[in-house]
Amino acid sequence: MAVQQNKKSRSKRGMRRSHDSLSTAQLSVDATSGELHLRHNVTADGFYRGKKVINK
């Protein structure tokens, strides 16, 4: 089992954790239906970049 050589300070611990935060999902509004969807993904209606790509 690994054991640290020296104790890390609160400052160093915080600096390491500063990159761990999660970012919110990037949402886009579809041009045809006005629906929110994830970037670079097909909407629930089957539209992608203003064109129907999936027939339901």
From Swiss-Prot:
Q: Where are the transmembrane segments?
A: none
Q: Name one GO biological process term.
A: translation
According to the record, the residues making up region (Disordered) are 1-34
Q: Per the record, GO CC terms? A: large ribosomal subunit
Q: Per UniProt, which keywords does this protein have?
A: Ribonucleoprotein, Ribosomal protein
Q: Which GO terms describe its molecular function?
A: structural constituent of ribosome
Skewed-composition ranges (Polar residues)? 21-31
Tell me which InterPro entries the record gives: Ribosomal_bL32, Ribosomal_bL32_bact, Ribosomal_zn-bd
The UniProt regions of compositional bias labelled Basic residues, in chain numbering, are 7-16
Task: Tell me the disulfide pairings in this chain.
Answer: none
Homology family: Belongs to the bacterial ribosomal protein bL32 family.
What protein name is recorded for this chain?
A: Large ribosomal subunit protein bL32
